[in-house]
């Protein structure tokens, strides 16, 4: 795991910050190989047995079978098509939890050389370029991307990731420039970057999170864990 020192998450252009306590984050997202070991021990989370309340019909749809990921899900690639409930169960079994939006955005704002690269046009441009490309299949292995100044890898460039309080972002505006949308992105989510429309990558993350439900399983959505404090969401 990589340690992020305590700091403050700042919403650009709005004179308000939120404190973020120190936390320890997994260096990489959870892989198919790691998740396979989890479902071996916890059969209730196998594809054929999981309850519809906790995962939709797309859960692990790219795996060949309950205990056989297959060619579309290499062991060292991040696991996707997993619900929020499944991610939480996996991490609880390993003594960890999902990062909050604030924690994830705090870590994700760091580049290879800066703790806060939220004003770095080159850094933001690379993220936007990735968001504009289709997700490859199979997804490349973890470690394919860059590691930031904290030593955390693949926060951008491989997959989107679940957060503990993903549904705290509420997008209700009708256009990118809608004042109510900007207000909801900042006040509803209370984390980094979404209030600054120059940081379009952050806006896209908040919009994506607002579209999710906890049982959804999406082909480019995985997760990683953190060690820090009690779980408070849900």
Indicate residue ranges for each PLM-predicted region.
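Disulfide-stabilized, aromatic/cysteine-rich ligand-recognition loop
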Residues: 21, 77-78, 82-85, 96, ...
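Short, well-ordered junction/capping motifs at the entry into regular secondary structure
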Residues: 73, 128-156, 210
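Active-site microenvironments of metalloenzymes and redox enzymes
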Residues: 19-119, 123, 227-234
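Chymotrypsin/trypsin-fold serine protease catalytic domain
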Residues: 113-139, 183
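Cytochrome P450 core scaffold surrounding the K-helix E-X-X-R motif
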Residues: 2-8, 166-174
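Short, solvent-exposed loop/turn elements at domain surfaces
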Residues: 1-9, 32-37, 46-47, 194-200, ...
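Acidic glycine-/aspartate-rich tracts in secreted/extracellular proteins
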Residues: 165-167, 230-231
């Amino acid at each position: 795991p990589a340690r992020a020192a305590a700091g403050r998450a700042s919403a650009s252009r709005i004179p308000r910050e939120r404190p973020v306590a120190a936390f320890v984050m997994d260096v990489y997202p959870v892989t198919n190989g790691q998740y396979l070991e989890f479902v071996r021990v916890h059969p209730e989370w196998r594809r054929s047995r999981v309850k519809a309340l906790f995962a939709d019909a797309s859960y692990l749809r790219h795996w060949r079978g309950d205990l056989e990921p297959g060619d579309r899900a290499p062991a060292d690639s991040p696991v996707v098509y997993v619900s929020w409930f499944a991610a939480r169960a996996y991490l609880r079994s390993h003594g960890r939890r999902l990062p909050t939006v604030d924690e994830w955005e705090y870590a994700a704002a760091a580049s290879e050389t800066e703790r806060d690269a939220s004003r770095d046009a080159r850094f933001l441009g690379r993220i936007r370029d990735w968001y504009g490309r289709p997700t490859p299949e199979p997804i490349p292995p973890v470690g394919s991307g860059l590691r930031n100044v904290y030593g955390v890898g693949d926060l951008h460039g491989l997959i989107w990731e679940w957060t503990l309080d993903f549904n705290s972002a509420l997008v209700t505006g009708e256009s990118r420039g809608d004042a109510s949308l900007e207000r909801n992105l900042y006040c509803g989510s209370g984390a980094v970057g979404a209030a600054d429309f120059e940081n379009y990558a952050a806006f896209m993350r908040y919009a994506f999170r607002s579209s999710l439900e906890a049982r959804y399983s999406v082909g480019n959505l995985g997760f990683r864990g953190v060690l820090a404090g009690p779980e408070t969401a849900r």
